[in-house]
Amino acid sequence: MRVIAKKILRDFWKLHADSEDQLKTWYKEASKASWSNPTDIKEEYAKASILKAGRIVFNICGNKYRLVVDINYLRQWVFIRFIGTHSEYDKIDANTI
């Protein structure tokens, strides 16, 4: 998968240093993955939430942070749509952000 907007992750872990290792690990794993559907993701990330229209929510640092991505399975693209604290996540609509 090609992860688009790594800078968003990098900027976030500069502000939240405790997230750096897990975000780097997620980025590396996602970059090497060849997901073809949400089931592939659930096999690797059982706690990921599958939303509509290709959106996936990943729990980072034991659900302290939330990462929302939009996936184009055909083109193998992962777009970072949101990374934030759990309380920040509660204020957005993950389906449309």
Residue ranges and their predicted role:
Residues 1-64, 72-79, 86-97:
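Basic, Lys/Arg-enriched alpha-helical interface segments
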